[in-house]
A protein has these predicted regions:
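Catalytic core of PPM/PP2C metal-dependent serine/threonine phosphatase domains
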Residues: 33-103, 177, 181-192, 196-197
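PP2C/PPM-type serine/threonine phosphatase catalytic core
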Residues: 89-127, 131-133, 138-139, 146, ...
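Active-site-proximal, acidic helix/loop segment immediately C-terminal to a metal-coordinating Asp/Glu
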Residues: 27-49, 131, 135-186
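Cytosolic ligand/metal-binding cores
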Residues: 18, 22-23, 30
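Single conserved hydrophobic/aromatic residue that forms the stacking wall/gate
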Residues: 1-7, 11
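A short acidic-Thr-Gly-centered motif at the start of a beta-strand
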Residues: 11-15, 79-83, 128-130
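DG-centered beta-turn motif at the end of beta-strands
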Residues: 24, 95, 140-143, 191
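Short hydrophobic/glycine-rich mini-motifs in sensory/regulatory modules
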Residues: 14-20, 133-136, 190
Length: 202
């Protein structure tokens, strides 16, 4: 079973694969929201049309490049989870690090790359991991890290994630966001999205 909570989109396919997408438009306000919505909607339609994940990501990037005259750039964090094997593949395009929580242990997944829409030839950076029953994947947008008032922001966020005791994905995502907001006085300075996905054996 997969449990997800946050402002990302989850697509379930008939072959037992789950796709989770978190996108953050560059800038802020309505324009940034429109860019990230375009990315998520386009990827969903391409997957529903039968395109592979790799083809969908390339077509999405090309579409963003075409509209780049309007400076349309977005980060894309795209996770694919095989619900039979627990295999996780992350494709990052300019996206913030993601984290795997296994009990009290937290590991980081990061791949530096440009956001979607910059170069028609660019490709997402891929990484593979295997999730065990009880593990959580935590995906965030840049804003979650940027406003932590410490030198080692990534380490601080890892400590926050490790400190969450709930095994409910929704509670976990909210607790992480609430803790980060303590550093901003409760005000979201930028898009601050947290998505938590838990994996459990039936």
């Amino acid at each position: 079973r997969l449990r997800s909570r946050g402002l990302g989109d989850v697509y379930k396919r008939q072959d037992g694969m789950y796709h989770v997408c978190v996108s953050d438009g560059m800038g802020s306000g309505k324009q940034a929201q429109a860019e990230s919505t375009l990315v998520v909607d386009l990827l969903e339609k391409l997957l529903e049309a039968g395109f592979s994940r790799e083809s969908a990501l390339k077509l999405m990037n090309s579409a963003m490049v075409i509209s780049a005259g309007e400076e349309s750039y977005s980060t894309v964090d795209f996770a694919t989870i095989d619900m039979y094997t627990g295999e996780l593949e992350l494709a990052k395009t300019g996206a913030a690090p993601s984290f795997i929580k296994s009990g009290k242990k937290v590991s980081v997944i990061e791949n530096e790359s440009l956001p979607a829409g910059v170069d028609v030839w660019q490709e997402s950076k891929h990484s593979k991991n295997t999730l065990q029953s009880g593990d959580f994947l935590v995906m965030v947008t840049d804003g979650v890290l940027e406003y932590l008032h410490v030198k080692d922001r990534q380490g601080k966020l890892m400590d926050i994630i490790a400190g969450v005791k709930s095994d409910n994905a929704g509670v976990m995502a909210q607790e992480i966001l609430d803790r980060v907001l303590l550093d901003t006085g409760g005000y979201a300075m930028d898009d601050m999205t947290v998505v938590a996905i838990g994996i459990w054996e039936k």
